[in-house]
Amino acid sequence: QNPIEFNKIKNIYNAKLVRYLFDTEKYQSEEDYREIFFQEYLDGKIDKNEYYNAENSFKEFIKYLSRISNVYVCYDFLASIENSYPFQNSSDVNFSLDFIKETQGKFTKIIDKFQLEQVSILFAREIVCGFIVLDDIKSVVICSGMHGCILSVNDLDSELLSAISLQVKVEKISALQN
């Protein structure tokens, strides 16, 4: 996780919350770490399969969470969708413009698979930034592309951690660090 993002999360949110970092990039050491961005795929800097494997892992991660909890989202566009290069180059996705424009900036319950798929891709491709609330497990997923932080009232149980670690690298932050 980017240290600046981590410190921002640390300073904004309640210190009593349990924190987990997640990332679709499953690297062995910090030297091996390389973030995967849709923009890099569009620019030809990463392989199509590498990008889509990471995006599919992220979507499966969100889909799994939606099976164990109600899902609410709140997001804002990083740039207007008319000017968003990643959005304009997402012709492989059948977005409902009415849905994504209506829900932008609003706390919205996701009620079907189509909405969940769209929201997952908006986050994965860094078209939006925001958070996903999982009320049944009292947790919030803060996304920055296909990585971010899970803030939880309680420790996530080992079965849940095991299931989501099949899709993303997940690591508990044991103590607040500078």
Label for each model-derived stretch:
Residues 1-149, 154-178:
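Structured alpha/beta or helical-core interaction and ligand-binding surfaces enriched in interleaved
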